[in-house]
């Protein structure tokens, strides 16, 4: 997208929006956008690395899918969980997750929903009751009063949904939306529908939490031989918002860290493709914002 006259960047729908693999190839051939020196892989820091003075240590996890029992949680100040903390968003699962959060020693815990948190998506639940009663029987048989305020079960964290919070001077924004995939929660068509959500992200955000990846950063699905990240999310991150950290999950195969030299991109999916919770939490230190 172009720039408006007064300097504010406006993102428009990318011409390759609907085909992320083609978009990746196009931008690589024409701009080397996803190759060194523009981007490179980053090794996670060991857990016993001393935290530098004047820094805050973030611990990133995602896609724990109710399998939190065996996860070794490292030292840190702030926990970031990028969604899919349940299988279906059942209240019993949410309570179990909240209990797990309550036992963790982090000073702050920030959580967003993912496509598996079906009950958190009010539009999804309204449609499910009307149409596809047998697809998720355990969800369909919930009464509205069981799930209407399901996010209030998350008493041990800050829950973000198209909203932000300032913690230790860091502005953190969280959003659950992902490109349509088999009709799960918070799924939207690629293009304008998703861009409308990313346009809600204000400038001046230090840490962006989304459930899924942007195009080209830890979004490769080997068995499909496809990139699946959102092109509009990438353009929003790189051209408009420019956070220090963009943390996500959603694509279990994409676990790991990359940087474009300004933003660090972390896919913190804890579960593997076979839903084993064996990818370790990722620790990331950020210098505290100057209190100007």
Language-model segments: what does each one mean?
Residues 61, 66-167:
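Core catalytic region of metal-dependent phosphoesterases/phosphodiesterases
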Residues 60-62, 79-84, 108-115, 160-161, ...:
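Active-site neighborhood of phospho(di)ester-bond hydrolases with catalytic His/Asp-centered motifs
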Residues 1-60, 64-68, 123, 286, ...:
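Acidic, histidine-bearing metal-coordination/catalytic regions of metal-dependent phosphoesterases
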């Amino acid at each position: 997208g172009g720039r408006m006259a007064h300097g504010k960047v406006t993102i428009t729908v990318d011409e390759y929006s609907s085909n992320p693999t083609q978009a990746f190839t196009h931008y690589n051939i024409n701009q080397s956008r996803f190759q060194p020196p523009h981007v490179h892989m980053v090794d996670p820091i060991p857990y016993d690395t001393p935290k530098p003075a004047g820094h805050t240590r973030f611990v990133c996890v995602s896609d724990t899918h109710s399998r939190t029992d065996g996860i070794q949680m490292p030292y840190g100040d702030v926990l970031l969980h990028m969604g899919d903390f349940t299988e279906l968003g059942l209240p019993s699962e949410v309570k179990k997750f909240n209990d797990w959060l309550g036992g963790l020693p982090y000073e702050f815990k920030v959580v967003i929903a993912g496509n598996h948190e079906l009950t958190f998506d009010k539009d999804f639940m309204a449609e499910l009751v009307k149409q596809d009663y047998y697809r998720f029987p355990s969800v369909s048989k919930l009464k509205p009063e069981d799930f209407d305020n399901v996010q209030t079960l998350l008493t041990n964290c800050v829950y973000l949904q198209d909203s932000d919070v300032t913690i230790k001077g860091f502005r953190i924004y969280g959003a659950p939306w992902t490109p349509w995939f088999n009709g799960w929660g918070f799924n939207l068509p690629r293009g304008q529908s998703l861009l409308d959500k990313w346009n809600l992200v204000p400038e001046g955000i230090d840490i962006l939490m989304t459930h899924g990846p942007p195009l080209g950063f830890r979004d490769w699905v080997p068995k499909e031989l496809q990139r699946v990240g959102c092109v509009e999310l990438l353009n929003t991150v790189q051209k408009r918002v420019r956070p220090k950290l963009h943390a996500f999950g959603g694509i279990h195969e994409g676990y790991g860290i990359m940087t474009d030299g300004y933003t660090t991109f972390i896919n913190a999916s804890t579960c593997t493709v076979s839903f084993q919770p064996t990818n370790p939490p990722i620790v990331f230190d950020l210098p505290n914002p100057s209190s100007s």
